[in-house]
Structures are given as structure tokens and as C-alpha cells.
A protein has these predicted regions:
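Membrane-interface coil-to-helix junctions
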Residues: 45-138, 142, 154-181, 213
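Alpha-helix initiation and N-capping motif
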Residues: 40, 71-72, 84, 103-106, ...
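Membrane-interface starts of transmembrane alpha-helices
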Residues: 32-36, 115-123, 144-152, 198
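Start-transfer (signal-anchor) and selected internal transmembrane alpha helices
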Residues: 3-50, 243, 247-252, 256
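Transmembrane signal-anchor helices characteristic of membrane glycosylation enzymes that use polyprenol
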Residues: 33-70, 255-269
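Short helix-coil transition/hinge motifs at the ends and kinks of transmembrane helices
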Residues: 238-242
Length: 270
């Protein structure tokens, strides 16, 4: 009897292991089209800036050049002392540097996450890649097929306005705009009951968005979130599902609060 029990236990355990492996392999197979799309975005972004990026050319961006000039004293002080100064004498006879390329220890972790999200692509290349990937995530959250999402992302990313602000050097605005679509994706997923994935996306991209330091764009985006929440609330009211609506709204509020708290040092001085 004990031998039969051991054989049965071994068989059950083996079956369970093979089932887990099958499920993992199946999950990876489902992700293959999305991974192909991401690689395609990286290739498209790189090809668009060829041969300029491989040859090391630098785009003369007015705002970026002005920013470098304004922060020259700040940079030299940091190189000389290793400390970060919060004051400069080079603008308006002296002013705080809180919003001149702000850097705070509490938000430094986001730099590594952002680089990973951009696949460590070169400057200029990752600008377009971030626009492509962000809108792709949004369309996938709306359950569009892979090819439709990829096409929509390309149409979005290659809007003329984005290249105008790249040329002008409005990089903080571009970064913020790149992180808004995936933040909306997180919101959509939460209201569809995918609390963990949606909450993580909302927290991550709201943090990255605020860290991009273009509060004006983030402020405008708050209105989008507000009206989307109203729309989901009306839908929940019609379906007598207000309890679920408040629960999901609470998850979103916590996710957004986390994104804000990570950037609190910067926001405090804004």
C-alpha cells in the first residue's frame, strides 16, 4: 500500500511540474509577438536617426543649449566639490537651482528604471522608442491586436509635433508625453479588475512622468484621469457595481500617491 502511495505521489508531483512548465512556456509564447513588436520599435527608432547617431552627430537644440549654459556654474561646482548646490549666480543675478535639471536621492532609483525601459538606447533614439512603446502599451491595454497596436504606436510616435519639440530641445515635455499613455493603460487595467498589473503600471509611469519634470503636462493629464474616472463611475452606477468602482479607484489613488511620494523632494520645491 505504501509503495502504491509513493508511486501515486511521484506521478502527481511530476504531472504538476510538467503542467507548470507547460504553462510557463505557453505564457512566453503568448509574449513573443509583443517582444517582436518591441524589437521592431527599437530598430525603427535607430534607423530613423541613421547615420547621424552612429556617426556621433549632435542635434543643436536651442533649449538644451540654453539649459547647459544656465547650469554651467552648477556643473563646475559639482565637479570641483562633489556637492550639489541649490543656488546659482548666473541667472537673474542669483536664483535657486531647484528646477534646473533637478536631482534628488529619493528619485535617483527612477533613472535606472527609465534606462531599462528605454533599453539603454542612445540619445535621440530612445526619444522615439519611448513614444512608440508607451502608446503600444496603451493600445494593448484596450485589447487591440498586436499588429493594430504596433501600427497605432507608429502613427502616434511619428506625429510631426514630437519631432518639432525634439529639435527645439523640449525634452522634459517629450518625456512626460511619452509616459502619459502607459499611465492611462494602468488606469484602464485597474478599472477592468487587473489590480496588480494596472496598479504597478500606474505607479511606475506616474512616477516617471513626474520625474520628467514638466509639471504643466502632468497637470493637464490630471484632467484626463478625472474625466475617465467619472466615465467609469457612470458605467459602474448603471451596472450597480459602485462597490467595485470605489475599490478600483482606491487602488488607483494609492498607485498615484506612490508615484507622487517618490518625487516629493522635487515637488516640494516646485
Amino acid at each position: 500500500m505504501s509503495t502504491n502511495v509513493r508511486i501515486f505521489s511521484w506521478f502527481t508531483l511530476s504531472l504538476h511540474r510538467y503542467y507548470k512548465r507547460f504553462m510557463i512556456m505557453n505564457a512566453w509564447k503568448k509574449l513573443i509577438p509583443d517582444m517582436v513588436a518591441v524589437v521592431m520599435f527599437a530598430v525603427i527608432s535607430f534607423v530613423y536617426f541613421c547615420p547621424a547617431v552612429p556617426e556621433g552627430r549632435i542635434l543643436s537644440q536651442h533649449d538644451s543649449v540654453a539649459g547647459i549654459g544656465a547650469g554651467q556654474e552648477h556643473s563646475e561646482y559639482h565637479k570641483r566639490t562633489g556637492k550639489v548646490t541649490r543656488w546659482t549666480n548666473s541667472i537673474f543675478g542669483g536664483m535657486p537651482t531647484y528646477q534646473m535639471a533637478p536631482s534628488y536621492d529619493s528619485a535617483n532609483c527612477l533613472n535606472g528604471i527609465a534606462n531599462l525601459y528605454h533599453l539603454y538606447l542612445p540619445t535621440y533614439v530612445w526619444y522615439v522608442f519611448a513614444m512608440l512603446l508607451g502608446f503600444y502599451i496603451l493600445l494593448r491595454a484596450f485589447n487591440f491586436k498586436v499588429w493594430m497596436s504596433a501600427l497605432g504606436a507608429i502613427i502616434w510616435a511619428f506625429s510631426s509635433y514630437f519631432f518639432i519639440i525634439i529639435a527645439a530641445g523640449h525634452i522634459w515635455k517629450l518625456m512626460t508625453l511619452a509616459y502619459i499613455p502607459p499611465t492611462i493603460a494602468g488606469m484602464v487595467l485597474v478599472y477592468r479588475g487587473k489590480y496588480l498589473l494596472g496598479g504597478l503600471l500606474t505607479a511606475l509611469f506616474s512616477a516617471l512622468q513626474i520625474s520628467s519634470n514638466h509639471i504643466q503636462m502632468s497637470y493637464y493629464f490630471l484632467f484626463v484621469m478625472f474625466f475617465m474616472a467619472i466615465a467609469y463611475g457612470v458605467q459602474a452606477f448603471r451596472e450597480n457595481a459602485m462597490a467595485s468602482f470605489f475599490k478600483r479607484t482606491g487602488v488607483l489613488a494609492l498607485a498615484c500617491l506612490l508615484g507622487v511620494c517618490i518625487n516629493l523632494s522635487n515637488l516640494y520645491h516646485t
